[in-house]
Amino acid sequence: MDRVDGRKQGQIRPVRMTPNYNKYAEGSVLIEVGDTRVICTATVEERVPPFLKGLGKGWVTAEYSMLPRATGSRTIREAARGKLGGRTMEIQRLIGRALRSVVNLEALGERSLTMDCDVIQADGGTRTASITGAYVAMIFALNRLVEQGMLEKIPVSDFIAATSVGIVKGRPVIDLCYAEDSVAEVDMNVVMTGTGRFVEIQGTGEEATFSREEMNQLLDLAAAGIEELNKVQRQVLGDIAAKIG
């Protein structure tokens, strides 16, 4: 049986990345995963957080937000509420952790990269799309530092991408759209490297449980999907991709 949008069980949504989407940022990309769209920008600053001052190493962090009408009904801006929501804080920490897992912070030197992931349209998988797009924006920014002679080489050991998987109506599926995510019995986000190593797995039963066998099926789906995402990343980066690792 096909899914709500006609996809097969192990088929990710169409992925498109538009590089240099923001003319001011050191690195940027608009990532589109189905109807989910996220603008990812990288900002380089020649300073580090106070806890890293004088240690000779850099930092990579992330911020995440959604436009009020990124969803079906308008949501109040978090700035208007006066504080970040728990979901937002969790997602931006996830993005930062994922990117730092492959960055040599010592080789980066005492400078910071701030990744801004702004969702302009949400249809499921915004956090995983943010990670996949932010990685590309980060590489563009680091390559600029290399070209300017500020870094000897791109201090990144591997590719990073992420996707969602879940169990919907008893079937393991990949890259859930909102309609699927809202009724999923199991929801899981998976972040992996280009060499197939796991960075993070977030899995939850929604009023349901799942077996070790089902979890393995979900991870196999995620690994195959992330391999496809890596191919898109390589295509967008072009010759820069060969400088990674």
Curated annotation (Swiss-Prot):
PROSITE patterns: RIBONUCLEASE_PH. The keyword Metal-binding does not apply. One of its GO terms (biological process) is rRNA processing. Phosphate binds at R87, G125, T126, R127. Its EC number is 2.7.7.56. SUPFAM superfamilies: Ribonuclease PH domain 2-like (SSF55666), Ribosomal protein S5 domain 2-like (SSF54211). It comes from the Bacteria. It is an enzyme of class 2 (transferase). Keywords: Nucleotidyltransferase, RNA-binding, rRNA processing, Transferase, tRNA processing, tRNA-binding. Homohexameric ring arranged as a trimer of dimers. PANTHER family: EXOSOME COMPLEX COMPONENT, EXOSOME COMPLEX COMPONENT RRP41. Belongs to the RNase PH family. This is Ribonuclease PH. It comes from Desulforamulus reducens (strain ATCC BAA-1160 / DSM 100696 / MI-1) (Desulfotomaculum reducens). The gene is rph.
